[in-house]
Amino acid sequence: MSDTIESILQEERLFDPPTEFSERAYVRSGREYEQLYSRAASNPEKFWGELAEQELHWFKKWDQVLDWQPPFAKWFVGGQLNISHNCLDRHLTTWRRNKAAIIWEGEPGDSRIITYAQLHREVCQFANALKSLGVQKGDRVAIYLPMIPEAAITMLACSRIGAPHSVVFGGFSAEALRDRLVDAEAKLVITADGGFRKDKAIALKQEVDKALEHGAPSVENVIVVQRTKADVTMTAGRDHWWHELQPQQSAHCPAEPIDSEDMLFILYTSGSTGKPKGVVHTTGGYNLYTHMTTKWIFDLKDTDVYWCTADVGWITGHSYIVYGPLSNGATTVMYEGVPRPSNPGCFWDVIERYGVNIFYTAPTAIRAFIRMGEAVPNARDLSSLRLLGTVGEPINPEAWMWYHRVIGGGKCPIVDTWWQTETGGIMLTPLPGAIPTKPGSCTKPFPGIVAEIVDLDGNPVESDQGGFLVIKQPWPSMIRDVYGDTDRFRHTYWEHIQPKEGQYLYFAGDGARRDKDGYFWVMGRVDDVINVSGHRLGTMEIESALVSHPLVAEAAVVGRPDELTGEAIFAFVSLEGNAEPSEELKKDLVKHVTEEIGAIARPAEIRFTDVLPKTRSGKIMRRLLRSLASGQEISGDTSTLEDRTVLDKLREG
């Protein structure tokens, strides 16, 4: 951690919110932020209770704002609401009825603009389609779709009838999909024939077929959206075309009153122990927290066109493409494609075409834009932009400066946000009209979030000292459980730092520091999770995929710094006795991992080795491998290393 602290400590630049922006913002000054933060900290139940009453529609008011039995939280106990109703129905009685809810553009250039009234109709029809196939409240529904409107429609239809959804990123392989279907015990899968990415049609239905062939006995039906028009196999009695099933349904489907603590969705995130974690989020607290963070952090106004470039397969897409913006009655942009050699300026074209005002993307995308050069964005009119955001990983100060100068024209505040799948919503962030920003810092906690930097004993560290980022008090959108594995929930998030006197600390797994001005600087993961392009991938999943190859005896995977993706995957591989290392075998292993997990987990480099550095108890010392992969000197304690000659062999490659 010391290197990271050293380099970031040199950052002294400070950018005040533009006066014109502050004058119109929800929170207009540092003083207002401090008052808001103080009010939330002194009486969180009153703070969140008042906001829940003002901002959301409830079928039945709660009896208790918070029931906190550490580490288990229940918010708005006894209250009933429906997030689909809050995202749709309540807007239909206002002028927003005919406002654009979703502006969608496909990679080939096709597009749709869907109003709130139209979206409500399609969601109701699809909710009835789900019911016609026997989906009931509490049944899990898996969604494996490209970035098309049907992804949002499906999520809202599931939440309308109380069926928790589990969205699986379309880049995951059949094997990874099957693991998630089995763990969630999904009753139904919604997929497409395929999607478009980087000028190629990507097959999805055939991956679902493979996953089901390998065994996911809970799945009874599959609904298929026709996107690429590819030929796909349809299994009679199990598979149904969306375009045949949905339009024949009634557009009348009242939103079910849902208990505040009923499960809204399961979203799988990588862990260091191999099996992906099914993060459970519930309804009321998540609805409120994503609503408020969207409103205040993006300073969202009714006239704004808002675009978050994430995929709905990740938490950012759940919270800040679908639920947060639509609950606020916003116009949210969905784009199927990504910048690619044939169209490096596609993002800037979307901004120019639709007059996007708020743009939220990942540092890895910004690094790619920098490589493409300034001429590409400079050829477009980006003057509609008034706020920029970053998400997924810490952004380095120079990328921040480029983003501010080239994309924001030097006038747009940047909200550099830190949060996780488990937190449900943004935790550390500037409020753009109130908090001066420092390039590379996610600045301060959102009102109601009590964050601290501590050592492993839970003691706060001094200013500018690196430590572990923890959250000290419950918040409405916090993870409720790991699906089917409460022991893992306790161990992963609440027992890294032992509770003292009943004080439980949520362990984020990130290293961080706080400077003399109280600004937080997140320094990256402290566990064995690799952050590639803002996506957290478990080392154990990748290692398991490598070892499943018949010629591989053992594998260890680490991250090494990468200018474009933040971290790249570096694999150390030991082969079976008579297997010979070769460039051909490296290519075969890369292909194998891609098939097992997906292209996102493809190793950037593979190094063959006879042995791996291990402790005397047989644990691989990944810390040493990280140093080797990054070309750094080995430092720190190596006393537990079983065979010291291993390091020399690895250095020689």
From Swiss-Prot:
Modified residues (N6-acetyllysine): 619
Chain's gene name: acsA
SUPFAM superfamilies per record: Acetyl-CoA synthetase-like
Gene Ontology MF terms: acetate-CoA ligase activity; AMP binding; ATP binding; metal ion binding
Organism field: Synechocystis sp. (strain ATCC 27184 / PCC 6803 / Kazusa)
Matches recorded under HAMAP family: Ac_CoA_synth
Entry superkingdom: Bacteria
Sites where the protein binds Mg(2+): 547, 549, 552
Catalytic function, reaction form: acetate + ATP + CoA = acetyl-CoA + AMP + diphosphate
Documented EC number(s): 6.2.1.1
Pfam families noted in UniProt: ACAS_N, AMP-binding, AMP-binding_C
Binding site for ATP: 392-394, 416-421, 510, 525, 536
Database matches in InterPro entries: Ac_CoA_lig, ACAS_N, AMP-bd_C, AMP-bd_C_sf, AMP-binding_CS, AMP-dep_synth/lig_dom, ANL_N_sf
Function in brief: Catalyzes the conversion of acetate into acetyl-CoA (AcCoA), an essential intermediate at the junction of anabolic and catabolic pathways. AcsA undergoes a two-step reaction. In the first half reaction, AcsA combines acetate with ATP to form acetyl-adenylate (AcAMP) intermediate. In the second half reaction, it can then transfer the acetyl group from AcAMP to the sulfhydryl group of CoA, forming the product AcCoA.
Similarity remark: Belongs to the ATP-dependent AMP-binding enzyme family.
Keywords: Acetylation, ATP-binding, Ligase, Magnesium, Metal-binding, Nucleotide-binding
Gene Ontology BP annotations: acetyl-CoA biosynthetic process; acetyl-CoA biosynthetic process from acetate
Positions annotated to bind CoA: 197-200, 316, 533
Post-translational modification as stated in the protein's UniProt record: Acetylated. Deacetylation by the SIR2-homolog deacetylase activates the enzyme.
Stated name of the protein: Acetyl-coenzyme A synthetase
Cofactor: Mg(2+)
Any single Gene Ontology cellular-component annotation: cytosol
